[in-house]
Amino acid sequence: MKQVAGFIGMSQKNKGIQQNQWHSGPPQGLLSGQTKAEQGTSSQQAGVNQGENSKSGAVVQRKMPMRRDVNSAAQRQHVRRLVYTPYFPNETWNISTFKNGAKDVERSVISTLNNVAENRVMDNCTSRVIFEMTQIQFESLPDIIRNEFTRVGDDALKWAVPEDLKSADLDHMMVVKLSTEGTIYPTTLIFPGGCSGMAKLKSVYSFLESQLERIVTPTPSVSLKYVTSWAEHLFDLCSGQLINSQNERVDKLLGYMIWDIEKAITLTDQVIACYNHPEVVLRRLGASDIACAVLAGESVVKLTRLALSKSPVDGCSCCRILELILNLPSRKPNDKVPQVPLDILFASVYRYVSAMCMGRVLNGRIDASGIQSTDHATASIKLNDIIVNDLELRSMGVDKTSSFRGTQSMRAFYVPENLAGSILDRINVLVMRHFGILHMWGFNGVVLQNQEGYCDYHIITGLNHLTTITHTNSMVAVHWGTESRMDNIFEIKARTLPTASETMITLIENALKEQLTSIVKDGLRKGVSFSVKRNINDSRFGFETNSSPAIFLKLRDMLKRAKPFSDLLSLALSKVIKKENAMIQRSITTVEVAVAIKMKVYGLDEYVSLMKVEKKEVESGSLPLQEFLKLKSNAAGAQSSTVAVKMKEEEVNSKAYCLISETIVVNMDAVRSACGVVQSENLVIKSELSGPELSESVTSGLMELLGRNAGPSKSWADQVEEAENEEEKQKE
């Protein structure tokens, strides 16, 4: 199949061949990857390459001169190319996200991972260590080393001969062996260098103490199960933050990313440093490092292949994640080094674990200092670049292009139809390996739309709404890092709990758009325009204005004063509830709404300065009122001249801001109660008969009715006796 991919990739270079014709089937030799020429057979001398048409059975003959080029041309001519455009539905998009190292997120990760390790990890201290040595090995050690085993006190080391260890109680003990020969105990450490390595040390106790600080040792009861399942336990703790049907898939995803990290480190000798503590480095296991050894089955011993350069720092989530990566089981590495760079893989693991833990501990809300804006355009650009720049995908025929929704051009990519299945699966793996750098811009999954606009392929992270709604408990203004061609964006994040109602969410978005337009226009001075319209390809809204400073200050004031924003939400939600008849939808108990307003504000400093000067001059009487009003009117259109200049040079006079609201929570049960749809308290009706008395009355009434209509009931014995009596009477 790789050879086929090579032909398809080459075929894209010839621009003179039509690309979108239906394919009747490439030659069989190409599909199987086994042309006679490539097998070194005598067909090269014959000069004919035969292939069977997969649909019609027609035989294709090609002459030897330029045979490979002819095959490529046929491939270009016949293979239909599909166009895929990334689309971010509401449930996969964050209107804000968290910074790496945000304090709230750090605490949530530490809390969760400590919970993961609880009752599964041993307390690594020298008092829990016992060395396995023969008498000969012990006596061969220098006196200074032997003294550490024979002295009395807390810093004394323990040792025993193999025969004594087999019958000893080793619960919560770590056995240090000088080699992998002999018995492997539930918790076993392999001392580097064996007996000779120990003899070279100045202090075995000090060496052991420093080494134990760098490893995570599973308890004997957990043994191998711990090192293979810490990620599973993490998923169990964070199950509320995951889409249940996706748990198994994303569990494997996280494990595969970590195994890719291990392979990259062990095969290429790369390292990962903690983001917060660069001196703490995860590297390949060295000759001077203690290794954990555990039994896999009955005979196979697995050794840790990674080591930390220094002790991890307490309270650091990044160090904690490095510890857990260190103790995953070793797997036989593939011959091929992973194509995704190591730093990108670790960023994906770090962000994925952080997102789950944040949802579990913080319910998706963090302090204002940890908030970061997202950007749809940047995420889309990075996503497309990841796909079209992958060498293997390019060799399979993937190439960049553009698609249009109305008049809007969007980034897209070509996929050969005959390889679409395998290509889309590889894209899925590739995109998820880049989860970290994409998540920092708002990505939480994506849908690939085909040229007809249908959602053809879903790339799902498995994270649910608790991790796709990241907001503070206060209004916040942050820098908007963007590559968008849109100057002004209005993003809404709404969710209904416990049942998701896409219809209701869409109605909420549209109602908020209408109310925002109404409230912002109210009170604007003459000459300032403002209009909102939905973006063609996603759930965002764009808005246009001829005075971005005036609108920005108006919107910021609306959030700051809170009451106008409250009125906006109340009016919008009341319309939705009436239209959707949500008052009687018992499946929805809570509605949550948050908004992000993203703007490129041109000339804000000059605008504010002008307003301050004008206000002072008007108050002092030095500037006539009519002149002041004229200046204000001119300021409304000041943006147009500013933009004309800035389009030629870099926009040094523009600042990109993102205003993020609090998450507003509406209790629908309380709304229903207040509106009289349901009673706040159940009214108890006192009956003259108790429950048992009423049941007895019904039974008696039923017996009376049936007895009156059908006579008294007779038992089977009575009926037999009556029949016998009747028979005797007839005989007489």
UniProtKB/Swiss-Prot annotation:
Q: Which domain of life is it from?
A: Viruses
Please state the span of the N-terminal signal peptide per the UniProt entry. none
Sequence ranges of Polar residues compositional bias: 13-23, 31-56
According to the UniProt record, where is the region Disordered?
A: 13-74, 706-732
Acidic residues: which segments have biased composition? 719-732
Which named protein is this?
A: Non-structural protein 4
Organism of this sequence: Wound tumor virus (WTV)
